[in-house]
A protein has these predicted regions:
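N-terminal beta1-alpha1-beta2 submodule of the flavodoxin-like/Rossmannoid cofactor-binding fold
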Residues: 1-102
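Short, glycine-/small-residue-rich phosphate/pyrophosphate-handling segment
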Residues: 103-124
Length: 124
């Protein structure tokens, strides 16, 4: 099986609890013989939009069509998910809307999950 993890951490990897847990999950998948790709959204140059845009994020969105599972990893910020994951959800909106109109369901038969980390600041 092929998995893709979208890492929505806002911090550099060395300081990020989210990145540490993402790497643990990636290693666990690989130990089970599964392919796993990690995309750290913070490292990409992409537009925040609810439309189809050709930028550094676009090829990774296409990868969703060719994998078996997608995981969105985010820290908790002020009781909610991080801004990078929010942008990712917004970028998926045109695909969902297009599929409703065309009876093509690229998200069907895929496993979607979330990985949420918190407490890095000792408060949440």
């Amino acid at each position: 099986m092929r998995f893709i993890i979208f890492n929505g951490t806002l911090k550099p990897d060395a300081e990020s609890n989210t990145s540490k847990v993402v790497q643990m999950l990636k290693l666990a998948f690989e130990k089970l013989g599964q392919e796993c790709k990690v995309v750290t959204l913070r490292d990409l140059n992409y537009e925040r939009a609810t439309k189809d845009v050709k930028d550094e994020l676009a090829p990774h969105i296409i990868d969703i069509f060719n994998c078996d599972g997608v995981i969105f990893a985010t820290p908790i910020w002020w009781g909610g998910h991080g801004s990078y994951i929010q942008t990712m959800f917004e970028r998926l909106d045109p695909i969902y809307s297009w599929s409703k109109d065309n009876k093509y369901q690229p998200f069907y038969n895929k496993v979607f999950g979330t990985l949420v980390s918190g407490g890095g600041d000792g408060f949440q």
